[in-house]
Amino acid sequence: MKDKKFFIPDGIEYYMPKEAISFETLRHKILKIFKKYKYNYVIPPIFDNLENLLTLKGNDLQNETIKINNYSNDGTIGVRVDITPQLSRIDYQSFLEHKPNRYCYMGDILRINAEGFDRKNPYQVGAEYFGQLTKKVDVEIIKLLVDIITLSKSKKILIELGDLSFINLFLQNLNINSKTRSILLDFINLKSNHEIKEC
């Protein structure tokens, strides 16, 4: 008699019928948003040559990537832990066109350690802009992000901007003197919401 128990590896997520339909519906809504902002959809493979997966510096990618010997050419292939490096390689192929490129992607990734995620096989969604960065591009990518996050119907959205140049440019465009601008920047760094409102 066959064992009817169904086991899946720890940290790996399955989508059952109802969840799969909801998931696909959400995926199509996200694709429509990408199309609205003229981002071109690409689907890189989950297995790729190691050099395509490790184009970004950092031990995280190196340590988390599952490596497999490719006996057909004595090379090494890996299972991606992040799709972003593959986008860099895709953009490199069209570098000679000398024009800004917008790419978007969605796909499974696999991590040895689930730290920072709710599973070992999270589904990654992202957009990459390759070209000269401007204030317009910064605003565009933030609006795109907000449109996608809004699909979650969360009542509160918090966006942390790691690059202070955006905040500095924003504050420079406000009609305030340099002293107030400096105080406001300090409050922003301290995340002092009450003081920011009072300012």
Please provide the spans of the model-predicted regions.
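Extended, charged alpha-beta segments that form solvent-exposed binding/catalytic grooves
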Residues: M1-C199
